[in-house]
């Protein structure tokens, strides 16, 4: 879901003075997860100007020469091909001009040019020139027409952003799965205003007397099957284009402007969460009814596609056939266009499961179907009708707008819930001083509850409130759980810093090394969808943690790998046209069986590359990835061995390796299979990935084992042993495994290492001192010492370790 700050400001005017970060915090406080914040990148050298004169180009019938005033005493000569400029009604209105030196977001640099004998000092901008990333949302004609703005102060020559609502900020959010009511910006604003402690303005009920001037033929025989079926009728309309302020708001929320009436209806849907179908009333034949389709039928829709209607689909139909697939899309036959004189605004509230099934079968996921595929309350429908009516109520429309075609009775509140305030405080973990009875009543009232002493009645649209424990979650929204003082947790397993064994320092050094190499450290969500959890599960982890009441399916389980999350970061940045780079992340991977620290990295761009010298930099390939893996592992004082992956689920055949330390597999590195990159919009682009389980390395550094034994009065007994390996086959860990098998040796230390030759073969000699454990209070005998020495030699011989006897 997209939330426009400017749209929200209609309901919470003071939100314009609230920082974006605070809005994010408060949205998260009421359970709404903020995925991203979108803000427009403003090109330099663009400004408002006034169109003073337009003449045909003397040498080209498709071009025009414009005089554009950009200051009180300065005009520019601009050649344009925008045909709407020749309309005499546009003279002395404001346009947006790109001056010499401007670099538009599509890469075009504006220069002074001689265009067929006429000097042009700039360019008149269309919306696509300014915001090319929204080209697919531009209304017909607006992609080539120069922007012409009405009702601007005649001396205004400055910033143009506010007149297109490009100074807006849009929050990309995910709603809790049990809060479909928050699809309505009205209900969302009420909760957000409560936690922001700002006034909110929501009510829009008309007090004007409206007449039933037009008996629109609605057949209500099937109305009982719907929560509501009806709408409004508007007559004698003049279809025009919406002002750019309205178009800008719609585009910001990824809705395509159409015309002034359809655009207003779409804005009402944004506020209320209730979709509206707009029909040209004069193109409707006979009566209109809501029904379940009984036979196969095709409908040419507003998007110029044909859709197959099957028995059981919910439709609105006239006597000639279907005019809308409810909650999904309308028919082109009754489309509102420039010839329309009378409009019927159709509103339906019906079982969302049936609409969801039809939308999935048809493969439609548009604005209307996303809303109607979830429950919509009668309060949202009632708000829709009121907002729709008020949007068109003005002196010119009196006598043109009808009453509601059908009555709607939406209860204001839900069932009664009896509250014990002390129980609430105990459940939340606060004192009466922190949350007294008066505060509880005020908080719940600000969230829309009706309070009668210790009885709370939730708003009827709050279907998620069923028991008194649910009320505690509402209070936490206002209290802000993050500000409640924490209780100290006493633990006997506190992390201790040791002067020699400090894993934190090792991780910090590794982070610095990777950042020096140009890798960006990112932090991604631990919670993902069950489907995504199966992606790139390199270590085959199972027994996942599941969230009981997740905000959404997208945040319902704890992940078991990091590469999927990193690929999502690349995908998101690519969608925003940001420059891509190499990234890495440290994060714990948790299952019900384990909790281990991983590092993952994606390498897809040249290291130390240059924009000016394309050949400069370190290209990514498997040797480079081996070097990266070795750098990470050597940071903890270990060496890494590599074993090939001949057939793998995730990496391209023969371009993947297992990472092995002390004969233990700790990670993978390789070229990610191309077909796996398709869901991330990276298919066809080589992406190398790496993921390492750092837990073993960190445990080796951080584990501090203590044993407490009485101080012995006996002298330590120790012996030395010398052994060797061929220099190229030195495996000291083989000796470590051998000596650990002897319970009679309680510690050992390496006292010398040197390289030499034996029979002309280079070897490495090791000398180890080992200490014998005394199980009695008497000195060890020579026989006991000799027995331990013999046992150690036997273990070495079994391990094929050459001893120096």
From Swiss-Prot:
Start and end residues of each tRNA-binding domain: 40-162
Predominant location: cytoplasm
GO BP terms in the entry: phenylalanyl-tRNA aminoacylation
Keywords attached to this entry: Aminoacyl-tRNA synthetase, ATP-binding, Cytoplasm, Ligase, Magnesium, Metal-binding, Nucleotide-binding, Protein biosynthesis, RNA-binding, tRNA-binding
Compartment(s): Cytoplasm
One cellular component term from this protein's GO annotations in UniProt: phenylalanine-tRNA ligase complex
GO molecular function, one term: magnesium ion binding
SUBUNIT field: Tetramer of two alpha and two beta subunits.
Designated name of the protein: Phenylalanine--tRNA ligase beta subunit
């Amino acid at each position: 879901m997209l939330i426009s700050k400017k749209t929200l400001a209609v309901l919470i005017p003071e939100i314009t003075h609230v920082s974006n970060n605070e809005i994010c915090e408060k949205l998260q406080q009421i359970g709404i997860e903020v995925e991203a914040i979108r803000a427009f990148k403003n090109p330099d050298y663009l400004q408002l100007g006034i169109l003073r004169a337009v003449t045909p180009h003397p040498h080209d019938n498709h071009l025009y020469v414009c005089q554009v005033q950009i200051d009180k005493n300065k005009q520019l000569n601009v050649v344009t091909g925008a045909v709407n400029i020749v309309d005499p009604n546009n003279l002395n209105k404001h346009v947006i001009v790109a001056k010499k030196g401007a670099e538009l977001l599509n890469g075009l640099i504006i220069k002074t040019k001689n265009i067929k004998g006429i000097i042009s000092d700039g360019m008149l901008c269309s919306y696509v020139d300014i915001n090319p990333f929204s080209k697919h949302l531009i209304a017909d004609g607006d992609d080539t027409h120069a922007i012409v703005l009405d009702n601007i102060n005649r001396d205004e020559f400055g910033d143009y952003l506010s007149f297109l609502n490009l100074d807006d900020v849009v929050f990309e959010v995910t709603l809790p799965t049990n809060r479909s009511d928050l699809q309505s910006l009205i209900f969302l604003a009420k909760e957000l205003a409560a936690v922001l402690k700002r006034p909110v303005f929501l009510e829009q009920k008309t007090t004007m007397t409206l007449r039933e001037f037009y008996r629109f033929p609605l057949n209500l025989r099937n109305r009982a099957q719907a929560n509501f079926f009806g709408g409004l009728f508007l007559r004698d309309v003049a279809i025009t284009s919406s002002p750019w302020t309205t178009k800008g708001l719609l585009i910001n929320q990824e809705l395509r402007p159409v015309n002034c009436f359809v655009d207003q209806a779409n804005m009402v849907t944004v506020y209320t969460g209730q979709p509206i179908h707009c029909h040209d009333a004069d193109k409707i034949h006979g009566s209109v009814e809501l029904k379940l389709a009984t036979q196969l039928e095709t409908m040419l829709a507003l998007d110029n596609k044909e859709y197959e209607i099957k028995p059981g689909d919910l439709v609105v139909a006239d006597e000639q056939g279907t005019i809308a697939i409810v909650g999904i899309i309308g028919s082109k036959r009754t489309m509102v266009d420039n010839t329309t004189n009378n409009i019927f605004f159709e509103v339906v509230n019906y079982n969302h499961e049936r609409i969801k099934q039809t939308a999935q079968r048809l493969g439609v996921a548009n604005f209307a179907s996303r809303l109607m595929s979830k429950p919509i309350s009668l309060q949202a429908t009632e708000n829709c009708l009121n907002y729709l009516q008020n949007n068109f109520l003005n002196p010119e429309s009196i006598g043109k707008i009808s009453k509601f075609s059908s009555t709607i009775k939406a209860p204001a509140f839900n069932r009664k819930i009896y509250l014990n305030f002390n129980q609430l405080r105990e459940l939340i973990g606060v004192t009466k001083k922190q949350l007294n009875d008066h505060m509880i009543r005020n908080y719940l009232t600000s969230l829309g509850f009706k309070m009668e002493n210790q009885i709370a009645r939730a708003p009827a649209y709050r279907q998620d409130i069923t028991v008194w424990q649910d009320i505690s979650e509402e209070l936490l929204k206002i209290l802000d759980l993050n500000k409640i003082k924490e209780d100290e947790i006493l633990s006997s397993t506190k992390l201790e810093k040791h002067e020699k064994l400090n894993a934190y320092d090792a991780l910090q050094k590794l982070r610095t090394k990777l950042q020096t190499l140009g890798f960006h450290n990112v932090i991604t969500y631990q919670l993902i969808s069950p489907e995504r959890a199966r992606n790139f599960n390199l270590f085959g982890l199972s027994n996942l943690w599941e969230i009981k009441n997740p905000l959404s399916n997208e945040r319902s389980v704890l992940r078991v790998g990091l590469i999927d999350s990193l690929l999502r970061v690349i995908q998101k940045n690519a969608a925003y046209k940001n420059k891509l780079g190499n990234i890495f992340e440290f994060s714990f991977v948790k299952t019900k069986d384990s909790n281990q620290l991983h590092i993952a990295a994606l390498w897809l761009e040249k290291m130390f590359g240059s924009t000016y010298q394309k050949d400069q930099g370190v290209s990514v390939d498997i040797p480079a990835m081996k070097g990266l893996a070795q750098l990470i592992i050597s940071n903890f004082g270990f060496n890494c061995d590599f074993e090939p992956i001949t057939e793998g689920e995730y990496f391209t055949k023969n371009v993947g390796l297992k990472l092995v330390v002390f004969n233990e597999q700790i990670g993978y590195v390789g070229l990610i299979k191309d077909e796996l990159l398709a869901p991330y919009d990276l298919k066809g682009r080589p992406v190398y990935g790496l993921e390492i389980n750092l837990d073993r390395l960190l445990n080796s550094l951080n584990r501090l084992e203590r044993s407490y034994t009485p101080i012995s009065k006996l002298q330590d007994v120790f012996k030395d042993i010398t052994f060797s390996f061929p220099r190229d086959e030195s495996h000291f860990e083989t000796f470590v495994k051998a000596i650990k098998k002897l319970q009679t040796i309680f510690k050992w230390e390496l006292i010398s290492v040197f390289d030499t030759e034996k029979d002309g073969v280079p070897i490495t000699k090791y000398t180890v001192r080992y200490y014998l454990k005394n199980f009695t209070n008497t000195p060890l005998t020579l026989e006991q010492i000799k027995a331990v020495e013999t046992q150690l030699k036997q273990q070495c011989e079994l391990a094929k370790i050459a001893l120096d006897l």
